[in-house]
C-alpha cells in the first residue's frame, strides 16, 4: 500500500446517487422561500436561465442563492447535520460498485469534490481519507455566513498537487484529470457514449441506471 498511488474520489453520483449539496439543503431547510427558489430552478425558464447565467458569469446562481440559507448556522451544527445526512445516504443511495472499487484498490483516498465542506468531511472521515478537497463554506466566529469561501466545482485540477494518482469519478468535467491519471474508474450514466468516445485506454467503466431523469 505504501507504493500505491492515491485515488482521487468524487462524491456526487460517484459514491452516492445524489447531488449532495442540494439534497443536504433540501433535508435541513424548511423555509417556504427556499422551497420556492428550488421549484423555480426546476422550471424550464429557471433551468435554462441558470445555464445561460453560468455561461456569462461562471457562477451557478441556483447553488449560490441556495447556500445563503445556511447563514446563521454554526459549523458544529452543520457538521452534525452532515454526518446524519451521509448516514442516511449510506442506507438508501450508496453506489456499491464504487465502494467495491475502493476496497479492491486498497489505495490512500483523496476526496476531491465540488460539494460543500461539511459533507465532504463527513464522507472523508467514513473512508479514512488521507486528504479532503472540497468547496469551502465561509464562517465568521464559527457561524456560516451563507457564502462560499472557495468553490472548486469546476476547478479541481488546481488542488491535486501530485503527479501519480488514480481517479474514481462520474463527471465529464473531470476528463482532463482522468487523462492524467494512471488508472481511471468511471461511473457512467446516460453519458456512457460520451465517455467511450474519449478512447481512454486506462479507464474501467461501470454503468449505472440514471435516476436523475
Q: What residue spans do the PLM features occupy?
A:
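Short, charge-rich amphipathic segments
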Residues: 26-36, 49-60, 86-97, 113
